[in-house]
Amino acid sequence: MCWRPLCRFLWLWSYLSYVQAVPIQKVQDDTKTLIKTIVTRINDISHTQSVSAKQRVTGLDFIPGLHPILSLSKMDQTLAVYQQVLTSLPSQNVLQIANDLENLRDLLHLLAFSKSCSLPQTSGLQKPESLDGVLEASLYSTEVVALSRLQGSLQDILQQLDVSPEC
């Protein structure tokens, strides 16, 4: 009689441990799909093809460049900066991309949680001091450079997800 609860518990535990492994792979797949979707959206904006992600533009040094090895924390911080820059732009082209970045950051937080990592909250990031001045002086260049660098960063993140990044 006392074996019955133990057997139920073991059966339930085996079920729960199996169920838990599947969603993490789904989250990782969803993350990769969303990255590919964002890259496609950037490609659909025709004027982003005219600038290299490596090109230096005065005043835009706060926009992250390419990072070959990224942790989940660094990915989140980088995407937070891009999200902040894109939401500061008045262009209608980038609104959906900024929303997609928020969703992508949420997926990265789920991946980090599955690895028992805690990502620092970056929602209250201060806007870079030079952003307003740069937006007034060269709105078009800021959008082009930000989207070009974001595309490169997303490609790096996509590659890192294949090798299971650290916290």
Swiss-Prot record:
Query: By what name is this protein known?
Result: Leptin
Q: Where do the TM regions start and end?
A: none
Signal: is it a keyword of this entry?
Answer: yes
> Which organism's genome codes for this protein?
Mus musculus (Mouse)
A single Gene Ontology CC annotation of this entry is: extracellular space
Knockout phenotype, as recorded, reads: Mutants are severely obese and sterile. Animals have an increased bone formation leading to high bone mass. Have impaired T-cell immunity, Th2 responses are favoured in mutants. CD4(+)CD25(-) T-cells of mutant mice show high levels of autophagy.
Q: Which cysteine pairs are covalently linked by disulfides here?
A: 117-167
Q: Which domain of life is it from?
A: Eukaryota
Instruction: Give the location in the cell.
Output: Secreted
Instruction: List the InterPro entries.
Output: 4_helix_cytokine-like_core (IPR009079), Leptin (IPR000065)
Q: Which Pfam families does this entry report, sorted A to Z? A: Leptin
The record's listing under PANTHER family reads:
LEPTIN (PTHR11724:SF1)
The UniProt keywords, alphabetically, are:
Diabetes mellitus, Disulfide bond, Obesity, Secreted, Signal
